[in-house]
Amino acid sequence: MPKYEIMTILDPKAEMAIIDNLLKTVFGDNSTEKLRKLETTNLAYPIRKSKIAQYFLVDLNAPTNLIEEFVRRANITREIWRYLIVNLDSEKGLNKKPKIRERNRKYTPRRDRFEKPNFRGNPKSRFDQQDQQATKNQQNFQQNQQNQTSQYRENSRQNQDDFQQVSSNQQNFGQNQQNQSGYHRENNRQNQENIHQNSKNHQNQTSQTQRNRRQYQPIKNPKFNQKEKENYNNKKPQSSN
């Protein structure tokens, strides 16, 4: 039959009879012979808003099914806050003390050469930590300010480049408009000159045609004598048959 060691933590206001009756009910009357109360009363962390409790330790031989029954009853008992069951056949119990050689042996773990040393004898005070945190916050704030300033300068430079590009485009557009206007004016002037020249040519042709018609028109005035008439007719060009 395996041997167990059971440690229980009880409410500081509870009586020892609670754990005594529970052990007798589950394991029998002889199970409480080695039950004892430990001197330790402090808790590592508060339980139900209390920092102290009662510690009880007992060694007994019991089958597995009775251990399970003890666990079930301990879970429903309000005065029992915590419990720990150790199988002494496979693990070391809480009641065994280490040997003097092992207890006085000092073991210093090997520290990596890249690891920072931990000086526990000279812990940093709360004010030093606050100063370091304030310095770190100030450095972060300055870094953020520099980043924002650099970003603002970059945006300003980009905006200036865009403005210069827009101004250049506007100037090119105005120059193109002027060139087109000058080209149209030159074409209009040239067209007007051509029209005027054509009109003059047409007038000259019309005047020449009229002069030719008057020159070659037969004279029907009876006052001309026959000789002048013959001279005129001789000057008139002959039509080709």
Swiss-Prot record:
Q: Where is the composition biased (Basic residues)?
A: 97-108
Task: Name the InterPro entries for this protein.
Answer: Ribosomal_bS6, Ribosomal_bS6_sf, Ribosomal_S6_plastid/chlpt, Transl_elong_EF1B/ribsomal_bS6
Name the Gene Ontology molecular function terms of this record. Answer: rRNA binding; structural constituent of ribosome
GO annotations of cellular component type: ribonucleoprotein complex; ribosome
> Composition bias, kind Basic and acidic residues: at what positions?
109-118
In residue numbers, the region (Disordered) covers 97-241
Question: Which cysteines share a disulfide bond?
Answer: none
Which residues lie in Low complexity bias regions?
A: 130-151, 161-182
Q: Which domain of life is it from?
A: Bacteria
State the Pfam families in the record: Ribosomal_S6
List, as start-end ranges, the regions of compositional bias called Polar residues.
189-202
Q: Which UniProt keywords apply?
A: Ribonucleoprotein, Ribosomal protein, RNA-binding, rRNA-binding
What biological process terms from GO does the record include?
translation
Q: What does this protein do?
A: Binds together with bS18 to 16S ribosomal RNA.
Family under the similarity heading: Belongs to the bacterial ribosomal protein bS6 family.
Name assigned to this protein: Small ribosomal subunit protein bS6
Q: Which gene encodes it?
A: rpsF
